[in-house]
UniProtKB/Swiss-Prot annotation:
GO terms for biological process: ATP synthesis coupled electron transport. Pfam families: Proton_antipo_M. This is NADH-quinone oxidoreductase subunit N. It comes from the Bacteria. It comes from Orientia tsutsugamushi (strain Ikeda) (Rickettsia tsutsugamushi). GO terms for cellular component: plasma membrane.
């Protein structure tokens, strides 16, 4: 029985998802709002238990294949908080759009959160594959959720084909790892790189295959090709999901893998260099790609590529065999909060037109929706990295860490990406405040759920900066 304690949050999420699905099926989706409230309440209880009783779950389970410690509990709490935000966004969306709603959407999101929790604690390649595939399959389904729209169906098919190809590459890599090391545990398989053997080339190739699958999920160039089309075709509420839960959990997975790889110093140096180059390529692709976009959803896609480039760079951009995971996680949390707040405001103000909206449609928004415009401006300023918002401190930490490592060429590239990205984000502020309106805005009532997400995300990007300023010593430790 003690072996089940470590996965009680995961078991609880799975069982509650099954209960919510049964309620939705027998009520013919008439209780979607009730199910949403139940899901939020359940996640809040789970967060409270993890916060106040973390010792209940700490431990190493099933022969070191599943690990729960304090840092992993923090990540699980963050994933559950973003799951609550996503449920609020969907609940608010079906209210403002006057839709019946589908309880299975909430269930699928909850299973996506479950996959994220599994990825955070996985110390075994098959457990990792289970978590990634759980999130992947849910992503395929949700992309096509607007099944009456051809763009949504096309995006879902593209995502499914590309996702299965990269999943197969990852699975082939896992099989080669087992064939060469007789183990699929991270610590045993990856530490085998310390001992030169005739199978070394095969093992390195296998690890690179696994990392290719992980970088695909993170939209790191050149494995980003799916991101703009899928974001553009999926409903905006699904884009909100793609911008948060999978990115946080898969980044945590990459941090776990690199933390074990660092013990094989020679192989780790080359693998780290490859990832660093790809992260820099993501900065270029994301910055210039966002520069050319008119569609808000494609803009969000290239923004994801750009910001994941920074997050991955934060993991590996140092001169020693050290993984700065806390810097990377801090950055991606701020990015995800800013993007969810932005998406919630768009849905709240444009309702049925929120999907496939263009940046030009935001022109003149400040004349009609002053508070919404202020909140969007704050999110954009944070994404640019303008003080006093948290986006500034996250970029400052990354650049300071790189500077201490003496990698000045990365500093130059990072600053160039910031400058180009600044134009993209500030262009939205310019459109809202300085261009005349091109569409008629609806004088709809303010939705509570969407407003709560937009305000909460704004509080996050402001309060994290204040916390860092008040606790300067803690900040110095991170840097």
């Amino acid at each position: 029985m003690e072996m089940l304690y470590g996965i009680m949050p995961e078991i609880s999420l799975l069982l509650s998802a099954l209960i919510f699905q049964l309620i939705g099926a027998y009520s013919n989706n008439t209780l979607t709002h009730v199910i949403a409230k139940m899901a939020i309440g359940f996640a809040a209880i789970l967060i409270a238990i993890l916060v106040f009783h973390p010792s209940w779950f700490n431990g190493i389970y099933w022969n070191n294949t599943f690990i729960v410690n304090q840092s992993k509990i923090y990540l699980k709490i963050i994933i559950l908080i973003f799951y609550i935000f996503l449920t609020l966004i969907y609940s608010g969306y079906i209210k403002v759009a006057n839709l019946k709603g589908h309880s299975e959407y909430i269930v699928l999101m909850q299973l996506g959160a479950l996959g994220g929790l599994i990825l955070v604690s996985a110390n075994d390649f098959m457990v990792m594959y289970l978590g990634i595939e759980m999130q992947g399959i849910i992503g395929y389904i949700l992309t096509t959720f607007n099944y009456n729209n051809s763009r949504s169906s096309e995006a879902g098919l593209k995502y499914f084909i590309l996702g299965t190809v990269f999943s197969a590459i990852m699975l082939f890599g896992i099989s080669l790892v087992y064939g060469t090391t007789q183990s699929i545990r991270y610590d045993i398989a990856l530490h085998a790189l310390q001992n030169p053997s005739s199978d070394m080339a095969v093992l390195v190739a296998a690890i690179l295959m696994i990392l290719v699958g992980v970088l695909f999920k993170l939209s790191i160039a050149p494995f980003h090709m799916w991101t703009p089309d899928i974001y553009d075709g999926a409903p905006l509420v699904v884009v909100a999901l793609f911008s948060s839960l999978p990115k946080i959990s898969v980044l945590a997975l990459l941090g776990n893998l690199l933390s074990e790889l660092k013990f094989a110093s020679d192989a780790f140096f080359y693998i780290k260099t490859i990832i660093m180059v790809l992260a820099c390529l993501s900065l270029i692709v994301g910055a210039f790609g966002a520069l050319l976009q008119q569609s808000i959803q494609r803009f969000i896609a290239y923004s994801a590529i750009l910001n994941l480039g920074y997050a991955v760079l934060a993991l590996v951009a140092n001169s020693s065999n050290v993984i700065r995971a806390e810097i990377s996680y801090f950055y991606i949390i701020i990015y995800a909060a800013s993007m969810l707040g932005f998406i919630a405001i768009i849905i709240n103000n444009f309702t049925n037109r929120a999907n496939y909206l263009k940046i030009s449609h935001l022109s003149g928004l400040s004349n009609v929706k002053k508070l919404s415009s202020i909140l969007i401006a704050i999110q954009m300023f944070s994404l640019v990295g303008i003080p006093p918002f948290a986006g500034f401190i996250s970029k400052y930490i990354i650049f300071t860490s790189i500077l201490k490592s003496g990698m000045y060429e990365l500093i130059i590239m990072g600053i160039a990406a910031v400058v180009i990205g600044s134009y993209c984000y500030l262009n939205i502020v310019k459109v809202m405040y300085f261009l005349p309106a091109t569409v008629r805005f609806q004088n709809s009532s303010v939705n509570f759920e969407l407003s709560l997400v937009s305000i909460a995300s704004t509080i996050i990007v402001i309060s994290l900066m204040i916390i860092c300023m008040l606790f300067g010593e803690g900040l110095n430790v991170i840097v």
